């Protein structure tokens, strides 16, 4: 639904409107507020809420609000009228009344009807969309319009854009803070949640702020690989992803910490980290998901064995490896995580796959075998593949190896990963709930 509440009041009713907004501040904070000149200033000064002001009533502010009703951006109008002592210069309600009737917008004209309107709005869920405008290769404006088209009829949608200057996790944490404050002051009927729209980096960054909060995460994938969405069975097309959110069915899944960095998918040591580094932004923009295949072929020619000390739940093993993958969740295309044939994201355990191919030919055989395991959902039977489980794992290597976590290079070994069971609430398709 539309995200704005319009506030108008005759002179003798301005104080009553300001006090009403103050009394229901937690609900009004979930919406964008727009008000005629002096009314908006009074509400802003008394409540501390952000209010966009249009012209005053005598200068046509009510007409500006009427235009927004026609545009479909107004969720409700609260216009406290003075039926006995209205002044000639004050706004006339008749135009707004006609438009609200035509466009089916709730209109309150006194405190009693205002209470009824906010009770209705209080039952509407608010989705805070964190939208990455540089993700993927599609038409960004069209994608955003498509999201609005599928979500705004069901929820109050508030949009935040990511930027290179601000950490996406910090953006999400600020929204989490506002949601918690609003929930503490409300009856909880209109719960809020956060939606991440972008690639795996955006999704991981937003999810990091939601771990162990209970606030649901919706995902609208628009990246190159969209690995987390694929792993959880979330549709990778915008209409399907929005439908999953609108259905409101949630699932609690595991997450992990990798060197104290939140992790949704997996940590790769050796081959996978080098491959991801080679598949840079320019290559992904040009080739899409094929960038990873191209980079993988290139890395297969260069990858060398390294010595690895692997400690799983306090038990240590030393071996030679070319790739070590520690997975919380992984799609079939993350072949180096497929030692068991599939990765569970609800069992409270990490899946560890170690590959130890010594030649490019052996490496190709390992990749083929692991991909077959993923398709058949059966464990690998290749002699150069070892699969293990554990709640926590620590890896040290000689020489040090690069580490990739959820598609981002974070440094070099040693690396320590701990599973956080049932720590993230996500909107999931019916079959995965």
Curated annotation (Swiss-Prot):
The active site is at residue 62. SMART domains: DAGKc (SM00046), MGS (SM00851). Residues 1-126 are annotated as: Methylglyoxal synthase. Residues 127-262 form the DAGKc domain. Signal peptide: none annotated. In the N-terminal section; belongs to the methylglyoxal synthase family. This is Uncharacterized protein sll0036. It comes from Synechocystis sp. (strain ATCC 27184 / PCC 6803 / Kazusa).
């Amino acid at each position: 639904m539309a995200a704005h509440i319009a506030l108008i009041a005759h002179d003798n009713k301005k104080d009553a409107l300001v006090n009403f907004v103050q009394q229901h501040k937690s609900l009004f904070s979930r919406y964008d507020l727009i008000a005629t000149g002096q009314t908006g200033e009074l509400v802003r000064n008394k409540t501390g809420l952000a209010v966009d002001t249009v012209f005053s009533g005598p200068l046509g502010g009510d007409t500006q609000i009427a235009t927004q009703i026609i545009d479909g951006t107004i969720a409700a109008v609260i216009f406290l009228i003075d039926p006995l002592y209205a002044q000639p210069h004050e706004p006339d309600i008749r135009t707004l009344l006609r438009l609200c009737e035509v466009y089916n917008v709730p209109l309150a004209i006194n405190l009693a009807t205002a209470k009824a309107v906010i009770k209705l709005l209080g039952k509407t869920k608010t989705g805070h969309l964190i939208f990455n405008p540089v993700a993927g290769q599609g038409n960004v404006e069209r994608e955003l319009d498509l999201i609005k088209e599928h979500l705004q009829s069901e929820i109050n949608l508030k949009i935040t854009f990511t930027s290179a200057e601000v950490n996406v996790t910090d953006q999400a944490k600020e929204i989490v803070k506002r949601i918690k404050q609003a929930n503490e002051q409300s009856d909880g009927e209109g719960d809020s949640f956060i939606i991440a729209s972008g690639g795996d980096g955006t999704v991981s960054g937003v999810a990091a702020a939601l771990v162990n909060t209970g606030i649901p995460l919706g995902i609208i994938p628009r990246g190159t690989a969209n690995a987390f969405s694929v792993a959880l069975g979330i549709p990778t097309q915008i209409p399907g992803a929005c439908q999953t959110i609108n259905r409101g069915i949630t699932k609690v899944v595991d997450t992990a910490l990798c060197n104290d960095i939140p992790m949704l998918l997996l940590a790769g040591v050796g081959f996978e980290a080098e491959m991801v580094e080679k598949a840079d932004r320019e290559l992904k923009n040009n080739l899409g998901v094929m960038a990873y295949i191209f980079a993988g072929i290139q890395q297969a020619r260069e990858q060398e064995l390294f010595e690895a000390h692997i400690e799983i739940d306090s038990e240590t093993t030393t071996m030679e490896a070319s790739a070590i993958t520690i997975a919380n969740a992984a799609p079939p295309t993350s072949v180096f995580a497929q030692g068991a044939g599939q990765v569970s994201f609800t069992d409270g355990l990490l899946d560890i796959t170690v590959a130890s191919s010594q030649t490019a030919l052996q490496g190709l055989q390992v990749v083929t075998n692991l991909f077959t395991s993923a398709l058949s959902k059966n464990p690998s039977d290749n002699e150069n593949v070892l699969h293990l489980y554990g709640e926590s794992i620590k890896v040290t290597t000689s020489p040090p190896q690069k580490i990739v976590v959820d598609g981002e290079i974070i440094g070099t070994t040693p690396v320590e990963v701990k599973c956080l069971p049932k720590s993230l609430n996500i909107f999931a398709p019916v079959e995965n709930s």
